Design a protein with these regions (language model features):
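Bacterial Sec-dependent N-terminal signal peptides
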Residues: 1-23
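A sensor for short, sequence-defined functional sites
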Residues: 20-631
């Protein structure tokens, strides 16, 4: 068997030509590559050739065998095409478990979705999902991309989580006077380097690589999987040449793009100056203009780089009343400048669990733009794309990250602030009147700050009633209501919500004259913490937080308490959980109080077992029951 396998590896460069002799048969995959794998990368050949400082071409050939439904991500084709990165051709071939050809799809058969053409020239997404009638199934992708702009060299993404690799080769050809840099992560891999005329050729090769087991709750996949990051030394983008060997030089290049994009008409400047004329300090001026931006401008969600890096002129945004992240941040910067306030744009990699930027490897890690107003005492950070975020608050989308500040002297890598538990609060108070027939009517008041305020506004203020009800039941864990009535105008104070529920059955169950009630109507924590016995990577919560709940049961007149759960007071390194239960005989009410606090949202892998045990106890406590009975 070993000899057969060695022969197979030797001929793998001609892999696809042997489909007729069943080399694509899933049974030929070595058993070691099926362990912990839901898909296998059978063959991959990536050729990236830099023609000049502003031009390159990418050719990709990939063959995947998907072993089961959990590997279906490998059946998705997704590429974008713009004036800077044109998808010239693509083809998909599908084979069954035995390597028999099933179907073929061309680029014209794929779903094409256009970007906003005002923001992305010739911009389209191309998508295609291969349907698996059975498993295993093999899919082959072949596509060509032409680059007009060379800031973003394609990385060598060797494997996804739960994916093994039979053969993968990445070849990069680059003029020696431009050259490239590389950084291997989660794998010890160095390239073979050769020269051919004026070009340097880098060749990375991987064979028979076992799957990396996925771990829920990690940073994004690229941070745990084998990968080679690749970046140019010199590049051109948006018709501007740049140097990427340092953060300073990268910042100088980006700053040059926006240098002449801060134009506002005299009328607009006067309007802004009048708007802030009553403000007593710069912070008040910033807040007034930020609120103006939120009320009057719309964000178009386009990731930084897809439509280029040059922001649209502030005058364009002022007229159109919309823009992407770089356009709105540039506009806000121009508005602040019009009232005498200096600010700096900052490039950042967004999402609470995005892979951290490596300070030692200058590269375009970034996909978003925010704004920074520096101060010795009180630096203000502004998220210019949100219509709901409070002034000076970033939220978990961009907090606690490395950002590239674009100053007049070039780029400076800085850290954005991080929120504390006390800045992300969720407090609920519910009074429920329980009837003899086990039905009930409840009134709930919810108060939020920080990340929970943003969530509340997103799911409740801006959704229809069915979605609102789904949020209350599925996300917050309230009982399924027969009737839902909001008793507070959400738009008056978006940090609070009040509503009434009519519920046909309040108890978890009844037995004879007894009712068994949950400790509280709102599930203060219900998310499962995955069971990794030997965790390798840090675990990410969306944010640190404080959650409190008070539930008051008004019992039927002829009922009394038989049993209350014992109070809890659980503490661990990163937080605590406390509960208390009391019965007031004079008014026949049960009051339950719970408090849950998490002080840090990134938990080191070596501490994971403690947090899993802690939150497991929180969920377990909810299974305890309040027992009431007829007198």
């Amino acid at each position: 068997m070993k000899k057969l396998f060695l022969i197979f590896v030797a001929v793998s460069p001609r892999f696809t030509s042997f489909a007729q002799v069943n080399v694509l048969d899933a049974s030929t995959i070595p058993a070691t590559l099926k362990e912990n794998a839901h898909s296998v990368k059978r063959e991959e050949k990536i050729d990236f050739e830099v023609k000049d400082i502003d031009a390159a071409r990418l050719s990709v050939h990939q063959v995947y065998t998907v072993l089961d439904a959990e590997g279906n991500d490998a059946l998705d084709f997704f590429e974008y095409s713009t004036a800077f990165r044109k998808l010239e051709d693509a083809e998909i071939k599908v084979y069954d478990a035995h390597g028999k050809f099933i179907n073929k799809y061309k680029l014209k058969e794929m779903l094409a979705e256009a970007f906003d053409q005002a923001l992305v020239e010739d911009g389209k997404y191309y998508r295609f999902r291969v349907t698996a009638p059975a498993y295993p199934i093999t899919v082959q992708y072949d596509y060509e991309v032409k680059y007009k702009g060379t800031l973003m060299y394609p990385d060598f993404d060797i494997a996804e989580p739960d994916q093994s690799v039979e053969s993968s080769i990445y070849t990069a050809t680059v003029p020696a006077d431009i050259d490239l840099r590389y950084l291997s992560r989660n794998i010890n891999l160095t390239p073979a380097i050769s020269t051919q005329g004026k070009n340097k050729i880098y060749r990375w090769s991987v064979t028979n690589l076992p799957a990396t087991e996925d771990e829920e709750g990690t940073a994004q996949d690229n941070s745990i999987c084998p990968q080679v990051l690749i970046a140019p030394n010199k590049f051109s983008m948006d018709d501007n040449n740049g140097d990427l060997t340092s953060w300073k030089s990268f910042g100088l290049w980006y700053g040059s793009l926006a240098r002449n994009a801060n134009n506002l008409s005299d009328d607009t400047k006067k309007r802004l100056q009048t708007m802030v004329s009553g403000a007593s300090n710069d912070k008040e001026k910033m807040k007034i203009i930020y609120n103006y931006l939120q009320r009057n401008f719309r964000y178009v969600s386009i990731q930084l780089g897809i439509g280029g890096f040059k922001p649209f002129d502030a005058a364009f945004v002022d007229q159109k009343k919309y823009g992407d992240c770089k356009a709105l941040s540039n506009y806000m910067q121009a508005c602040l400048s019009a009232v005498g306030i200096t600010s700096y744009q900052a490039l950042i990699r967004a999402e609470y669990n995005s892979e951290p930027v490596d300070p030692a490897f200058p590269k375009n890690w970034f996909d978003h733009v925010i704004l920074c107003v520096p101060s010795n005492k009180d630096t203000i950070w502004l998220e210019c794309t949100s219509n709901t975020t409070d002034f000076g608050v970033l939220g978990n989308f961009t907090e606690n990250k490395k950002a590239l500040l674009i100053t007049n002297d070039g780029g400076v890598l800085v850290s954005t602030p991080k929120s504390t538990a006390s800045e992300n609060k969720f407090n609920s108070t519910t009074k429920i009147v329980l009837n003899d027939d086990a039905s009930g009517e409840s009134e709930t008041d919810i108060k939020t700050t920080g990340e929970y305020k943003q969530e509340l506004m997103h799911f409740v203020m801006n959704e229809n009633k069915d979605d609102q009800q789904k949020y209350l039941v599925s996300r917050l864990g309230f009982l399924q209501p027969d009737e839902l009535v909001f008793t507070k105008d959400l738009k008056n104070d978006s940090s609070e919500m009040a509503f009434k529920l009519a519920v046909e059955k309040v108890p978890e169950f009844t037995a004879g004259s007894k009712m068994f009630l949950s400790p509280r109507i709102y599930k203060i924590w219900s998310s499962r913490i995955p069971g990794d016995d030997k965790r390798k990577y840090d675990f990410y919560f969306p944010c640190p937080f404080i959650k409190t709940d008070t539930t008051i049961y008004q019992l039927p007149e002829d009922y009394t308490v038989e049993n209350l759960p014992r109070p809890r007071d659980e503490k661990f390194e990163y937080g605590f959980y406390k509960t208390n239960y009391s019965y007031n005989e004079s008014n026949n009410t049960i009051t339950t109080i719970a408090s849950l606090q998490l002080n840090q949202n990134v938990i080191p892998a070596e501490k994971y077992q403690y947090i899993r045990k802690f939150f497991g106890g929180v969920i377990e406590e909810y299974t305890e029951k309040i027992v009431i009975r007829k007198k």
